[in-house]
Amino acid sequence: MILQAAEPVLVLASQSATRRTLLERAGLRFEALPAAVDEAALKESAEAEGIPPEDAAIMLAEAKAERLARRLPDALVIGCDQLLVCPMEDRSLRWFDKPADLAAARIQLLALRGRTHRLVTATVAWRGGARIWQDVSVPRLTMRSFSEDFLDAYLAAEGEALCASVGGYRLEAMGVHLFSRVEGEHSAILGLPMTPLLRF
């Protein structure tokens, strides 16, 4: 059975182990290459300018894909980005980053506890110097009101791996215990919505 055409070469503009695993499990042949983009600066600028999270996620995904597509004009380059946004008590919309360490992950998870947040997950495809496709998936996840003792046990069990996730949790592992409700495609929560990508 042919799942993928021989051409064009598929390139993932990401070093994310989770995204690579999603593509591998779908039986796709691809190369994963880093895109030298200052994500933090782009994200900070977008937030400061009041750009909606959906537009900011597309902008970040596109920056990654475009950077590699200019070097690899015949390839089909997939760029991805994911933003976590959550309304807070003061009605502001807070944008979260990957925690720097477990102490930061603890603070972040306490801020998300008992709230519903959105994972704005953008995917773009570039080929021949132009964007030819884009998708934005927005799963909604509600954390239960867990105790601090539970949180400390979770952090000890998962360790530094949590710092690789914008949420400070891994839904595909023990992080599932943190939630009372999850809405949206599982692969979108993990950072690469496979259903729309494979339809494209």
Q: Model-predicted segments: where are they?
A:
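Glycine-rich, phosphate-binding/catalytic loops in enzymes
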Residues: 28-31, 101-102
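A short beta-strand-loop structural module common to alpha/beta enzyme folds
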Residues: 30-40
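Cofactor-binding loop segments of dinucleotide-utilizing enzymes, especially the Rossmann-like FAD-
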Residues: 15, 35, 128
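Short, charged, surface-exposed secondary-structure boundary motifs
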Residues: 41-47
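Anionic-ligand binding patches
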Residues: 2-10, 47-200
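Surface-exposed, flexible loop/turn segments at secondary-structure boundaries
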Residues: 18, 38-40, 131
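N-terminal beta1-alpha1 ligand-phosphate binding loop
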Residues: 2-28
